[in-house]
Amino acid sequence: MTTFGTIEQAMAEILAGRPVVVVDDANRENEGDLIFAAELATPELVAFMVRYTSGYICASLTEDDCDRLDLPPMHHTNQDRRGTAYMVTVDARKGVSTGISAADRARVIRLLADPSTTPDDLARPGHVVPLRAREGGVLRRTGHTEAATDLTRLAGLRPAGVLCELVNDDGTMMRVPDLERFCAEHSLVLVTIADLVMYRRRTEKQVELVAEARLPTRHGDFRVAGYRGDYDSAEHVALVMGDLGDGRDVLVRAHSECLTGDVFGSLRCDCGLQLDTAMELVAKEGRGVVLYIRGHEGRGIGLLHKLRAYQLQDKGRDTVEANLELGLPVDARDYGTGAQVLYDLGVRSMRLLTNNPAKRAGLEGYGLTVTERVALPVQSHPENERYLRTKRDRMGHLLG
């Protein structure tokens, strides 16, 4: 049986200058990262990390610190499949030799964590990889990048952490049984990102319920709840029907905003049909939630960028090709704020209305349980045939 530590134990270890091991969800990377506080970096800690990890040492920083230190993205289009935000690599400009030694890397890591460091103190490129953590931490993105800044901040230190993936002697990634043995051998605390999410949920609130009212629709009467996110400032809406707190799984649709499909009835996508069908199914069941997530227009690229992508699609590109040609991610959505709204409404386990497996994984990463994926019907016609085919063949949607 795997023995995980508590987040409080991990915080105490980090504050004492010791590393911890953090593992993410089995549906995500399913990897364990060695993490310690950047401001407490020593040559010994870096050497230990190099010995037992891939050696690709990263330093997770807040968005503000990345901007203050003039750390631009490694590439203008982030095509990393997990959305890890790699910045241009750095070394210390002074006080180092080649930059690759444990002592040299410990020095630049401490510089990155020091609020008095200026852009001129850093040389580019270098041997340490800064990562840009999402504002809101693991409540916005359940990655090791955000776990590193969250744990150091919660420990009372600067929100800057050092991280690298633990590997076996043969170079394969350590999974939970390997991580458990490693932690036992080296007396390290092992925690999960899911537990960090739950800890922050217990101690912090990231969404605010602003207003509630009755909303009569052609599908029946819903209770409409309006929320504002603390970090994204977007205004999200949940249509609620029935009692959500009776212990049964809740039928849920987490719907991404789509002005063209939801409001104007565009035939280029199936968004409007999915929204209407979700409301109908929840009303038929008499219990459930239709969550309308703002800021997801065009899979997160925004309305005007979506219209630019439409221009390219009119010239023969598919929806994936168009985004990439514009230098935009294929899918920039995160479900952290939406998951917090569902949690605040009382949802703990759900039957999720979606054809997109990534949406299921996105919500489960925030401590919600999806017991069943409920497929939504698909209507193919000449205007959306290629779009649906691309979603199925290139984005992994389950369209039957």
Curated annotation (Swiss-Prot):
Residues the record marks as active site: 331, 333
Q: Which UniProt keywords apply?
A: GTP-binding, Hydrolase, Lyase, Magnesium, Manganese, Metal-binding, Multifunctional enzyme, Nucleotide-binding, Riboflavin biosynthesis, Zinc
Question: What does the note accompanying the cofactor annotation read?
Answer: Binds 2 divalent metal cations per subunit. Magnesium or manganese. Binds 1 zinc ion per subunit.
Query: Per its UniProt entry, which superkingdom is the organism in?
Result: Bacteria
Residue numbers binding Mg(2+) 1: 29
Enzyme Commission identifier(s): 4.1.99.12, 3.5.4.25
Question: Which Gene3D superfamilies did the record assign?
Answer: DHBP synthase, GTP cyclohydrolase II
| Cofactor(s), names only, from the UniProt record | Mg(2+); Mn(2+); Zn(2+)
Tell me one Pfam family matched here: DHBP_synthase
As its record notes, the protein acts as a catalyst of:
D-ribulose 5-phosphate = (2S)-2-hydroxy-3-oxobutyl phosphate + formate + H(+); GTP + 4 H2O = 2,5-diamino-6-hydroxy-4-(5-phosphoribosylamino)-pyrimidine + formate + 2 phosphate + 3 H(+)
Where are the stretches annotated GTP cyclohydrolase II?
203-400
Q: Which InterPro entries match?
A: DHBP_synth_RibB-like_a/b_dom, DHBP_synthase_RibB, GTP_cyclohydro_II, RibA, RibA-like_sf, Riboflavin_synth_RibBA
Binding positions for Zn(2+) per the UniProt entry:
258, 269, 271
Entry binding sites for Mg(2+) 2: 29, 144
- Pathway the protein acts in: Cofactor biosynthesis; riboflavin biosynthesis; 2-hydroxy-3-oxobutyl phosphate from D-ribulose 5-phosphate: step 1/1; Cofactor biosynthesis; riboflavin biosynthesis; 5-amino-6-(D-ribitylamino)uracil from GTP: step 1/4
The Gene Ontology biological process terms listed for this entry are: riboflavin biosynthetic process
Give residue numbers for the site Essential for DHBP synthase activity: 127, 165
For region DHBP synthase, the annotated ranges are 1-202
Q: Which GO terms describe its molecular function?
A: 3,4-dihydroxy-2-butanone-4-phosphate synthase activity; GTP binding; GTP cyclohydrolase II activity; magnesium ion binding; manganese ion binding; zinc ion binding
Q: Where does GTP bind?
A: 253-257, 274, 297-299, 319, 354, 359
Q: Cite the binding residues for D-ribulose 5-phosphate.
A: 28-29, 33, 141-145, 165
| Listed HAMAP family | RibA, RibB, RibBA
**What is the similarity comment for this entry?**
In the N-terminal section; belongs to the DHBP synthase family. In the C-terminal section; belongs to the GTP cyclohydrolase II family.
According to its UniProt entry, the function of this protein is described as: Catalyzes the conversion of D-ribulose 5-phosphate to formate and 3,4-dihydroxy-2-butanone 4-phosphate. Catalyzes the conversion of GTP to 2,5-diamino-6-ribosylamino-4(3H)-pyrimidinone 5'-phosphate (DARP), formate and pyrophosphate.
Name by which UniProt lists this protein: Riboflavin biosynthesis protein RibBA
Source species: Salinispora tropica (strain ATCC BAA-916 / DSM 44818 / JCM 13857 / NBRC 105044 / CNB-440)
